[in-house]
Amino acid sequence: MLKYAIIFAVISLIAGALGFGGVAAGAAGIAKILFGLFLILAVIFVVLAALGVGAVRKGMK
């Protein structure tokens, strides 16, 4: 999925340089959504690593 975020970011940069407003806006929008998703996942994994995965299992019981 990170691969798609990079692809859409590159497409939006190229389309923006060439002046294709609609294509650039669409690709940039998708890239922003994927970036936000990965940012949230990174924060979740950092918290899990700080607490230890065992803490999550104990809380679910």
Curated annotation (Swiss-Prot):
Signal peptide: none annotated. The chain crosses the membrane at residues 5-25, 33-53. Keywords: Cell membrane, Membrane, Transmembrane, Transmembrane helix. It is a multi-pass membrane protein. It is found in: Cell membrane. The keyword Transmembrane helix applies. Its main location: membrane. One of its GO terms (cellular component) is plasma membrane. It comes from the Bacteria. The keyword NADP does not apply. Belongs to the UPF0391 family. This is UPF0391 membrane protein Bpro_0066. It comes from Polaromonas sp. (strain JS666 / ATCC BAA-500). The lineage of its organism: Bacteria, Pseudomonadati, Pseudomonadota, Betaproteobacteria, Burkholderiales.
